[in-house]
Every structure is written in structure tokens, then in C-alpha cells.
Curated annotation (Swiss-Prot):
Keywords: ATP synthesis, Cell membrane, CF(1), Hydrogen ion transport, Ion transport, Membrane, Transport. It comes from Staphylococcus aureus (strain bovine RF122 / ET3-1). The keyword Membrane applies. This is ATP synthase subunit delta. InterPro entries: ATP_synth_OSCP/delta_N_sf, ATPase_OSCP/d_CS, ATPase_OSCP/dsu.
Length: 179
């Protein structure tokens, strides 16, 4: 189903670029995703209900999403017609990936054993942007005492691990190779 969501996201992304609505659509899609992320199971029930017609699913869209961008509403209608309303979170993720790629930015999760100061965060973000060649890094921080010390950064599938725990694991592997 991820491939299906990617197609919807790509179509919406292309339309948003063509109509100079990329920022507006991204903002509205973010709000919609937040609103429905805990309701995916109910949306799956709507999708799989054989007695509900496409028109009834469209009425649901109209009732829930009153003042949304017409391009998003049209995409929601297509999702409803094809019994894919429950894919909205996957569509959002795929759209967000396209959006981030367009602006050469990505999300980064920075884990450390304590709350980092703004100066420390700025240094880590600078390091991450240099390592990943991204223009912008959107940061989420987490405290992880298992790291023992240092920090670990996850950007997409890339992990930059400067933690004491990682150093100990690497040292342990070297000792195993020697023995």
C-alpha cells in the first residue's frame, strides 16, 4: 500500500508545485495528518465497509474536512472513491519526503544523555548539515541514558553515532576479533 500512497503523494506534490501552493498544501496536510493519525483504524473500517457507497465516503470527507485546499479535497475524494482513506498518513509521509527533497532538508533525531544547550545543538546541527550535505535539518531531541555519554543522530537512514556506548561496542568487537 505504500506504493499506492506514494502515487497519491506525487500527484498532489506535482499539482502543488504547478499551482505555487506547495507551502499551503504542506501546512494543511500536516494539520490533517495530526487530526487523523489516531483514527487510522476507524478509517480502515470505513474503507472496508461494503455497504458504504463512494458517495457516502465523499460525504464523510465533506463533513470532516470543511475548509481545506481544493487540491487536497480532490485527493481525499479520490482516496474515498478507491477505498484508500486510511492511507492518508502514508500519503502525508510520502508528501513530506518529496517536500523535504525539494528543499534539500530532512528530519534529524538527536539523542543524548542530557538536555543539550542551544550552543551544543547548533554545533551538532552544523556537523550534520556538513556530513549529509543538507541545506536544513529539522531537529527533534530525545534523552537516552543508555548512550552513557556523547550523542547519536539519525537522519533518514543515516546514523552518526558519537556515543560512549557505541565506543564500548566497537572496542568489544575489536577484542573479540583478537581472541
Amino acid at each position: 500500500m505504500v506504493k499506492v500512497a506514494n502515487k497519491y503523494a506525487k500527484a498532489l506534490f506535482d499539482v502543488s508545485l504547478d499551482t505555487n501552493n506547495l507551502e499551503t498544501i504542506n501546512e494543511e496536510l500536516t494539520v490533517i495528518n495530526e487530526a487523523v493519525k489516531d483514527k487510522i483504524e476507524q478509517l480502515k473500517m470505513v474503507d472496508s465497509n461494503p455497504t458504504q457507497t463512494a458517495e457516502q465516503r465523499r460525504e464523510l470527507i465533506n463533513g470532516v474536512f470543511i475548509d481545506i485546499n481544493p487540491y487536497i479535497k480532490n485527493m481525499m475524494y479520490v482516496l474515498a472513491d478507491n477505498r484508500h482513506i486510511s492511507l492518508i498518513a502514508d500519503v502525508f509521509k510520502a508528501f513530506q519526503s518529496l517536500y523535504n527533497g525539494h528543499y534539500n532538508q530532512d528530519f534529524a533525531t538527536i539523542e543524548s544523555t542530557y538536555e543539550l544547550s542551544q550552543e551544543e545543538l547548533d554545533k551538532i546541527v552544523k556537523l550534520v548539515t556538513q556530513q549529509t550535505k543538507l541545506s536544513k535539518v529539522i531537529v527533534d531531541t530525545k534523552i537516552n541514558p543508555d548512550l552513557i555519554g556523547g550523542f547519536r543522530v539519525k537522519v533518514g537512514t543515516t546514523v552518526l553515532d558519537g556515543s560512549v556506548r557505541n565506543d564500548l561496542v566497537q572496542l568489544q568487537r575489536k577484542f573479540r576479533r583478537v581472541n
